[in-house]
Amino acid sequence: MGMKMGGVNMLNTLMNTGYQLLLETVFYIMAIAVLAGAISGLFSEFGVISMVNKLLSPLMKPLYNLPGAAALGVITTYLSDNPAILGLAEDKNFRKYFKKFQLPALTNLGTSFGMGLIVSTFMIGLKLKGGHAGTAVLVGNFSAIIGSIISVRIMLHFTKKEYGTEEYCVQFEEHEDMDAIMNTREIRDGGIGGRAIEALLEGGKNGVDVGLAIIPGVITICTLVMMLTNGASADGTYTGAAYEEIAFLPWLGKKLEFILSPLFGFTDASGISVPITALGAAGAAIGLVPHMAEAGTVLANDVAVFTAMCMCWSGYLSTHVAMMSSLKVNKLTGKAILSHTIGGLCAGVAANWIFKLVMLFL
């Protein structure tokens, strides 16, 4: 890396990229975590989490082997970003539904739907040759669900070996009735207004703690991923500016094109750069698509795959480390990344073939 960029330029790029990530990514994630934490605190105080758990347990248990309350994490991350689920995980009224082996899988579950609304809205707005962008996005969302189930199930296979399947995250006294605890919740003293404000502030404070906890992981890991993903400046030279990198991952993708293209059905070899970029940042990945669509190298089938993989992966290499650290399960980070890599690949393959099947009837 230093030989290609020059030692001084490489160090300057490292520092500038880390600084830009702090300003543009970390504080953004912290803001999301604060808002999500505040909302989850409000939901917890007024029984929304308990209600969601009761309503969706019949669905979440067979699909994910998670309590129904986990569905609230899906909704939260779909509307915002991966770390939003951490604000929920800090709430005792949310954690009490989870056994110890289930909690680490929240990282995989939340990441599978991170930035879902943003990615979907962005892709629907594309002007594609042949149309069908809306159908492609629907297929992509459905395929992301498939990928999330695979990712979570693989992760639970590892966590069961680590924690067993009996112990709950929230410790209860021997004399306490488990059924009574699961069907009741703690509330604050005072009127509705006072309880709401207190819940919002306490939940937001949990979000600040989450935002601070993810700083080391985001800056170090995401900087490394960016160094391997992006290319040189516009004129092909290295100046030491942020995000000037050696573009190793796109180069690797082209070398593996003979394997990846049949699986994902890309219209053009350049399409592989989108899911590869999504490893580090979904926002950066979808930013590549409009130019490809204008050039005619991206069609509806590609959009289905991009939607599924950008949603399912949504920059997991840059957030998984921080999220697992925040949940205090660092030792399982490698297994979480492996599980999610497989889940994202399955989401992309599913999107390709499901879209082809759907188009037979349209």
Question: Which residue ranges define each predicted feature?
Answer:
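Transmembrane helical segments that form the transport core of multi-pass membrane transport proteins
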Residues: G7, A36, S40-L56, D189-A282
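Membrane-embedded helical hairpins/re-entrant loop segments and their flanking transmembrane helices
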Residues: I39-L72, A89-K100, L256-L260
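Alpha-helical membrane-inserting segments
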Residues: I39, F43, G147-M155, T159, ...
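Short helix-coil transition sites and intra-membrane helix breaks within transmembrane domains
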Residues: Y28-M30, G41-M51, Y64-P67, G73-G87, ...
